[in-house]
Amino acid sequence: MKLLNGTDIAGFIKERHRQQVAGLEHPPKLAIIRSQDNEAGDRYLKMKRAYGQDIGVPVDLYVETAGTILGRIDALNRDRSVTGIIIQLPLSDPDITDKALAAVDPRKDVDGLAPGTNFEAATPKATLWLLAAHNVDLAGHVVVVGQGRLVGKPLADRLVASGHQVTRCDIHTQDLPAATRQADILFTGTGQPGLIKPDMVKAGAVVVDTGAPKGELDPALYDRPDLTITPNPGGVGPMTVAALFDNLLIAAHQSQN
């Protein structure tokens, strides 16, 4: 088994980002908005704040309700000291999610989720960075399980645009195991812990778990020596934080030039 560890790679990227921040006339600032009752993303929120502190970037947190979030986004859009804005999903009121994401200034949408955004979605960007760093060849049949806005859909869209053969699976897929067994490279990002079982993965496959906060791979998959596989935690997660701050630094350079 080959583990696709992202922690060390993210550490190298962090040092590069620290040097880039030191070279800026004004350090960028990141604003994170989350719902009052959303504690599911606290692990990644802590990772983002720690990363920002390590590279010299202030990270401000705003806890909002469905009634206050759009006003907060508008204020942050107009605040010239704020370089990037993240909406920490999920929001407590799903009906406000589309409105909130659409309200973010595309020039500050460093998560890459707003319509017309200037940036590549952070988790797909991180996922492909991780594979490239480990010299994983994306040749072959790619299967993406989950078509959510954070990972599955933008990842599949990017792979298709790059000419890869991609099968998309979601809740409407009738025989998921049959689909995943065709994958040379299998990505999963559904939010369902333990979804992918050993008998759903072909011999020698590459398996990438983007699930958060809990992994989507059955622990027994890590007993298979034939697989190339991401750990969780320590795989895509640290790389996603690095990709997010990479987008923030791009935004900083754009705003200061």
Q: Which sequence ranges carry the predicted segments?
A:
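Short beta-strand elements in bilobed, periplasmic/extracellular small-molecule ligand-binding domains
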Residues: 49-64, 166-169
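Rossmann-fold NAD(P)-binding glycine/threonine-rich loop
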Residues: 98-111, 208-256
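Short glycine-rich anion-binding loops that position phosphate/pyrophosphate groups of nucleotides
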Residues: 87-94, 150, 191-194, 213, ...
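Short, well-structured alpha-helical segments in soluble
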Residues: 69-80
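N-terminal glycine-rich anion-binding loops that anchor highly charged ligand groups
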Residues: 21-31, 35-53
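Glycine-rich phosphate/diphosphate-binding loop of Rossmann-like nucleotide-binding domains
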Residues: 37-46, 121-210, 217-224
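Positively charged, low-complexity intrinsically disordered leader regions
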Residues: 1-26
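Anion-binding alpha/beta catalytic cores of soluble intermediary-metabolism enzymes, centered on
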Residues: 3, 84-137, 194
